[in-house]
Amino acid sequence: MQWVRDQVETYERTGGREAGTLRDTGIPVIIVSMRGAKSGTVRKIALMRVEHDGDYALVASKGGAPDNPDWYYNLVAHPTEVTVQDGPEPFFVRVRLVDGAEYDEWWQRSVAVFTPYAQYKEKTSRRIPLFVATRSTTADAEGAAAKRAR
């Protein structure tokens, strides 16, 4: 979608000073960059900013659609080749799918930030995947890239 590409470009260019909210909602977003599962090309998206103790929730809601967003498969394929930008500079993260009580806690945090998630959950028969992104080191991402190149 062009508006997503425009938002990502503006956010990155201004270090988050502009385009830091979801359209006209005033709700903050983060920029998530990842490697494409099939293409290997870097993909970027803006997601709702759900942060707790330095970790971030990445909610694969796709507006309650019956299928997962494409970026879900990118994160599953390359969980250590991900960056988050929450302000002027991006940083490396590792992502992991959560379940059980941890899922419930992060889901509650996510709905508190963006209440439409609750409607999305009611709208779909799938369990909306939820990743937690935790800060990582450059070495983690470089090691993953080196393994892939072999």
Please place each PLM-identified region on the residue numbering.
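Generic C-terminal helix-cap and adjacent flexible tail
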Residues: 136-150
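Extreme N-terminal tail/first-helix region
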Residues: 1-25, 146, 150
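Short beta-strand segments
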Residues: 26-61
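Short coil/turn segments at secondary-structure boundaries
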Residues: 22-26, 121-125
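Short hydrophobic/aromatic beta-strand or adjacent loop that forms the aromatic wall/cage
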Residues: 29, 127-130
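Short, structured beta-strand-loop surface elements
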Residues: 62-117, 123-127, 135-137
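Short, well-ordered beta-strand micro-motif
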Residues: 33, 132-134
